[in-house]
Amino acid sequence: MSIVAQKITYIHPDNQVLFKGIDLTINKGQKVALVGNNGSGKSTFLRILAGTLQAQEGEIIYPTPPYYVPQHFGQYDNLTVAQALRIDGKLEALRAITEGDASLSNFNTLADDWTIEERSLAALHAWGLEHILLSQPMRTLSGGEKTKVFLSGIEIHQPSILLLDEPTNHLDRRSREKLYDFITSCRITLLVVSHDRTLLNLLSSIAELSVGEITLYGGNYDFYKEQKEQEQASMQEKLEAKEKELRRVRKTAREVAERKQKHESRGEKQSVRKGIPRIMMGGLKENAEKSASKLKEVHEDKMENLANELKQMRSSLPDLQGMKLDFSASGLHEGKILVTAKEINFGYAEAGDLWPSPMSFQIKSGERWLIQGDNGSGKTTLLKLITGQLPPRSGSLIRADFSSIYIDQEYSIVRNDRTVYEQAQAFNERHFQEHEIKTLLNRFLFPHDTWKKSCGKLSGGEKMRLAFCCLMISNQTPDLFILDEPTNNLDIQSIEIITSMIRAYRGTILLISHDAYFIRELGIHQIITTFAGRLKTNL
C-alpha cells in the first residue's frame, strides 16, 4: 500500500511556520528513511501521517491506516499495555463472551479474532516481554520496554503501512538486531525517522526534510552521505566564487569612488582656470553627481544582494571544521595502567550478585573501551565502579590517579537555568576575555543571536556542541573520557560532529553505546560485555 502526502502545511500555535506545502509519495513496498536536522519537523510530519496530529493544510492518501510506533510515550502512561496497543476492546469483548454475554456488539467488536489474547502474549514474548501483563500500566515500564510493546503491536496488527519514529533510541544491542532483521525481511511499506545509521543502511531511499521541503535520494544512508558530500563540495565552490565576486565588486566600488573624488577635484581647478561661468559649472557638477550617485547605488545594490546570498549559503553550509577538541595531550604516557579489576562483582544490600560471574580486566592509557550489554545489565554501575563512585562487593579494583570527564546522553553539564553565554562563562577557568568566549561560541555554531537563549530550549545536538565548547573553554584535558550513550538524542549531523571530535582526542575512552556505526568509527580496542560478566577483545 502506498502513502501520498500532498501540500502539507504545519504551523505552530505561536504562528511559526514549520513547513509549508510539502509533498511525499512512498510506493507500495518501498522502505524510506526521513532524515533532517533536529527541529526540521520530522516527528511532526510522521505524526501527521499517523493521524495523531492535524495539519493546517494538505491531504494524506492511503488505502488503510498505518501502524505508528512513537518516539515519546508520555501520553500513554495512564493507559494499560492493552489500551496502548488498541486491543483492549477485543479483549473485553472476548472476556464478556466467555462469561456468557452473547450480545451482538461483543461479536462485532471481536470480529472472529478468537486468538487475540494468545497472539498478543506471543508477540510480547517475542520481544522479551513475557513478564509484562496486558493489564499492566504503561507508566511502570522502562523506555526500552515501552518501545518493545509498540514493536510487538506490528505482529498483532499485521499492518501494510508502518511508521517508526526513532525506534532504536531505547533498545539494547540484541533488540536492535531483532528490529534490523525485521526491517530487512518485511515486505510492507515503511517510513522511518531515525539517526541510527546501521538501520538507515537497510532502507532503499532517503527523504531529507530541510528548509521546509523534502528531497528524495535513491539508495541507503551511505549513498545519501556520498551525494550530500558532493553537494556540499559544489556549494563550497559556489560560496568561494561568491566571496571572490563580492571582493571584486567592493574593490570596483572603491575605485569608482576614488575616481569620482579625483575627477571632481580636477574639474573644479580646470573650471577656475578656464573661466567657466559658475551657473554652467554647477550644472555640469550636478549631472556628474547624479551619474556617480546612480553608479554608486548600482554597486551598493549588487554588494547587498551578494552579501545576502553569501549569508544564506553559509547558513546552509555550517563550518564544521572549526569544531575541534584542541586539548593538549594527556600527561599520561601511553600504556600506563589506570584500572585493574580482579574478580569483581556488585550487589545492593540483600540482593544477589549483579553479574552471573565476576569480571577481571585492565584499562591502560590510550585504549578505547566499549561497555555493552542488555538494558539493566549493570553498564552504568560498572562505570561507577571504575570511576570510584561505588566499591565492589567482591574482588579487588585498583585505580591509579587520573582525571576523567563524564558526558551522558542528556549532556547534563549544560544547566537548563543558564543562557548559552552564561553556560560558557561558567567554565571560563582560564579567564578568557569576553570576545574570546564569543569567538569560541561562534566556532561551535552559536552566533550572536543565540547567546541569550535559555539552555533549556536547546536541542540535543545544540547541548552536545555547547558541552564540548565548555570543555574547550576550561581546557581540562582529561586522562579518561567517559561517554554514556552520547548519540541517543542527536540528529545525524550532530553525531558526525561528535564522532569527528572524539576521534581526534588522544586520551583514553570508555564508551557505553548501542550505536554500532558510531562504535565502529571510534575504533574501539576492547569490549566488556556486562550481561554475561565476561571480557571480550577486538571488535
What are these model-derived regions, one by one?
Residues 31, 44-106, 365-368, 373-374, ...:
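ABC ATPase nucleotide-binding domain signature region
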Residues 1-11, 90-143, 147, 227-350:
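Coupling and communication elements adjacent to P-loop NTPase active sites across diverse families
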Residues 162-166, 171, 407, 480-485:
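Catalytic Walker B motif of ABC-type/P-loop ATPase nucleotide-binding domains
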Residues 202-218, 522-537:
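H-loop (His-switch) and adjacent beta-strand-loop-beta switch element
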Residues 22-33, 188, 359-370, 402:
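Pre-Walker A (P-loop) beta-loop-beta motif of ABC nucleotide-binding domains
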Residues 75-140, 409-470, 474-479:
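ABC-family P-loop ATPase nucleotide-binding domains
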Residues 144-163, 462-482:
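GG-anchored amphipathic helix commonly corresponding to the ABC/SMC/Rad50 NBD signature/C-loop
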Residues 5-8, 17-27, 58, 341-347, ...:
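Conserved beta-strand
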